[in-house]
Amino acid sequence: MSFQTIFDIQQSMAVNNRRMVGQQVARSGYITVAQYLTAVPWVFTIQPHAYLYYPQVRDIIQTIDNKDRQLPEQISFASTNLQWFVKMRGTATAATLNGAPAANTQTLALNSNGTFKAGDFIMVSGYVYKITADSAGSSVSIHRPLIGTPASGTTVFLGTACTFNVVAESCPTYTLNPMTDGAFVQWDSAFVFREYIT
């Protein structure tokens, strides 16, 4: 629950889900662009809450120290403070895969009970994707190639039901600023979490 707490009480969050794209400009001024096929992992840079009271959060800090940069954690955005990030804008509340998708596809055939809006979040076989264009619900385009080989009928989780499996790429150290009967925690930098793709 340690990394989840850092997400829940953050001061700010930067999100990177950009594709790997290379650009080359020739002397003539023409530009060449190429996209490299990668998993396009989610990366979250979290500015942690400053001045947490150490006697109240030392168990959380210990759990962070235990996981360090080695062990992953499932992060949910379903809390009241964070649900705005993944909340559905479309009307769909349930969906399954309609057929087995091709490897690395970016289009999914679905059986769903509603529509999807660009920017909606879905999760297939443990990996989260963003919908790239409005859809009536039978076929959706996703922002990155499908990871793995899910079977026909696989449940597709929507919106706040999506969870991100992340590992800390960067775990900051902290300074304790003494006060009466304790100290405030001051982090030396941001946490960086990268999607853990297996």
Predicted regions and their residues:
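Autoprocessing Asn-cyclization modules and mimics
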Residues: 57, 62-143
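Low-complexity, intrinsically disordered Gly/Pro/Thr-rich segments
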Residues: 167-181
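Ser/Thr/Pro- and often Gln-rich low-complexity regulatory segments
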Residues: 54, 159-169
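Polar/acidic, low-complexity leader/linker segments enriched in S/T/G and N/D
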Residues: 1-20
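Short solvent-exposed strand/turn elements
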Residues: 137-163, 187-198
